């Protein structure tokens, strides 16, 4: 049984990128679907789709690589964990890695990237960082 589906999903994406796999399959949840939606919008993955196998839902993620075959994801890190939650206000999430990275925030408006959360004027739980 998996206690933290977000950490599991991030680890699967990170490991698939290191092994240069074309796709990886994640367990489905609404938060993970929103998370990979942000990754796709920001250009860190090619695409994703929700599939159903034996009455269980999964998310199939197609990874993205540069022209040299290197994963476009340099670092993917879980910040807020079940044993230690991390919350930040809107002013603390404005920029990450001088604008080259993204902070994914769970807010009252849903799961948002840091620039969207800043524009909406909301803070929240820092789920992960990616660059």
Swiss-Prot record:
GO terms for cellular component: ribonucleoprotein complex; ribosome. InterPro entries: Ribosomal_uS8, Ribosomal_uS8_CS, Ribosomal_uS8_sf. Part of the 30S ribosomal subunit. Contacts proteins S5 and S12. It comes from Campylobacter jejuni subsp. jejuni serotype O:2 (strain ATCC 700819 / NCTC 11168). Pfam families: Ribosomal_S8. Keywords: Ribonucleoprotein, Ribosomal protein, RNA-binding, rRNA-binding. NCBIfam families: PRK00136.1. GO terms for molecular function: rRNA binding; structural constituent of ribosome. One of the primary rRNA binding proteins, it binds directly to 16S rRNA central domain where it helps coordinate assembly of the platform of the 30S subunit. It comes from the Bacteria. PROSITE patterns: RIBOSOMAL_S8 (PS00053). GO terms for biological process: translation. This is Small ribosomal subunit protein uS8. Belongs to the universal ribosomal protein uS8 family.
């Amino acid at each position: 049984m998996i206690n933290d589906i977000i950490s599991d999903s991030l680890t699967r994406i990170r490991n698939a990128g290191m092994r240069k796999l074309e796709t990886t399959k994640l367990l489905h949840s609404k938060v993970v679907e929103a998370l990979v939606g942000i990754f796709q919008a920001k250009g860190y993955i090619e695409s994703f789709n929700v599939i159903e196998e034996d009455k269980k839902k999964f998310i199939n993620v197609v990874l993205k690589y540069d022209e040299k075959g290197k994963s476009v994801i340099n670092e993917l890190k879980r910040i807020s964990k079940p044993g230690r939650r991390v919350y930040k206000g809107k002013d603390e999430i404005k920029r990450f890695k001088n604008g080259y990275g993204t902070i994914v925030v769970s807010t009252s408006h849903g799961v948002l990237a840091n620039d969207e959360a800043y524009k909406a004027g909301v803070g929240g739980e820092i789920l992960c960082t990616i660059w």
